[in-house]
Regions:
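Short, mixed-charge low-complexity intrinsically disordered segments
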Residues: 29-57
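Short aromatic-glycine-(Arg/Gly/Cys) micro-motifs in beta-strand/loop hairpins
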Residues: 1-10, 21, 29-31
Length: 57
């Protein structure tokens, strides 16, 4: 499966081969943007920043 990540304006942010890759990208994004909120669940965090994701096989 491939995970696709989009920001709040549906601009494509990246494609990831695994959920862990997508989570790592989000962790780097949080660090770069000085976001100090806790990310317990990847999908809840994506929702909290108003981003979107999709999966293709």
């Amino acid at each position: 499966m491939k995970y696709h990540l989009y920001d709040e304006n549906y601009n494509h942010k990246g494609d990831f081969q695994s959920l862990q890759e997508m989570r790592n990208y989000l962790c780097e994004w949080k660090y770069d943007n000085d976001d100090r909120t806790y990310m317990h669940d990847t999908f809840d965090y994506i929702k909290s920043i108003r981003w979107h994701w999709d999966i293709t096989e």
